[in-house]
């Protein structure tokens, strides 16, 4: 047996290598051909052959993609298909797995679409940096679409269910045909210039590439890019892409999804609103409590500085001054009484009659007449001086100036304060030229 240095492979290893080689060597490819041997088993996948006059290739389109086909695949139909080359390893079958397929008449439109998309992308119209964010709370929405299509019904139904408070303006337009793109562009520019709307939605239902061609118009794409109002594009089904989708600020796969993106679900808002209300109530109560405390402090300050408080303070001061004055007058009267008593004692001790008797006795004892005369004059001068001193402290002199000394007739005690007497009590008032009996009348003390 000959010795072999080459690697020996099993069929599965060889098929795996061939699959890796195919998938790594070929990018996404477009093929235009005729359908043949079309089958759709219960799994929902689509199997068929693409052929021309000289060759054919097996193809598969799995259910998630085949569901969105806009036509019914049939024998002999010419199509334009997009997919990747691969190898089904179990049988070693070389095949094309498709993710998109359309009728072949759309091929020229597809090439024009790809060329325009590449040019606009190179200009930066699709860049994420230039796209605007949607406002958190949309209040006014402009919807540009056909007034009779399924898209507008889906959008309005979702909006009414999720957030019926939204203000929606329907701007009716053609959505396919030669004049559709110009009409959509005009409505978009007018809505944007009005400044009335928070968001502008451009939408329509599904269709073929030719049906959706108005949304691949270059003028419309540039108008969307220039709009100051955020623009949402929801054209066709999830697998459909238009230039308006690429250039819009937000692309929604379907009209219904676009409506869901634009407004919150009112059922989800209820607990949020309740939490906000509870928080607002808490803040209001806190603010009210602070305001009431501040009002109480201000009220205390106002009461402390009010005229009534000032009068009360003055009244208390007046009462205190009255008490002090009464006490002072009592002290003065007591001192005057003491001085009167001392003066009376001094008067008694310096009685002129007694002093004169002594002098006369001394004069009789003196024999020389001249000496007696001088002594007598000296004593008279001294007597006058003493009399003046006594007169200065004599309470009767104070009475002579208009004052009175009030005493009780029963015991002769001096009345020093109005608080010591009672209404109706009889008293004696000593005046300069005599005394009078008085009676206490009720009144202010």
UniProtKB/Swiss-Prot annotation:
What catalytic activity is recorded?
Exonucleolytic cleavage in either 5'- to 3'- or 3'- to 5'-direction to yield nucleoside 5'-phosphates
Record EC number: 3.1.11.6
GO CC annotations, alphabetized: cytoplasm; exodeoxyribonuclease VII complex
The molecular function terms of the Gene Ontology recorded here are: exodeoxyribonuclease VII activity; nucleic acid binding
Which keywords appear in this protein's UniProt record, sorted alphabetically? Answer: Cytoplasm, Exonuclease, Hydrolase, Nuclease
Q: What domain of life does the native source organism fall in?
A: Bacteria
Q: What is its main location?
A: cytoplasm
Spell out the Pfam families in the cross-references: Exonuc_VII_L, tRNA_anti_2
- Where located? Cytoplasm
Q: Does the keyword Transit peptide apply?
A: no
Quaternary structure and interacting proteins, as annotated: Heterooligomer composed of large and small subunits.
What is this protein for, i.e. what is its function? Bidirectionally degrades single-stranded DNA into large acid-insoluble oligonucleotides, which are then degraded further into small acid-soluble oligonucleotides.
Q: What is this protein called?
A: Exodeoxyribonuclease 7 large subunit
Q: Which gene encodes it?
A: xseA
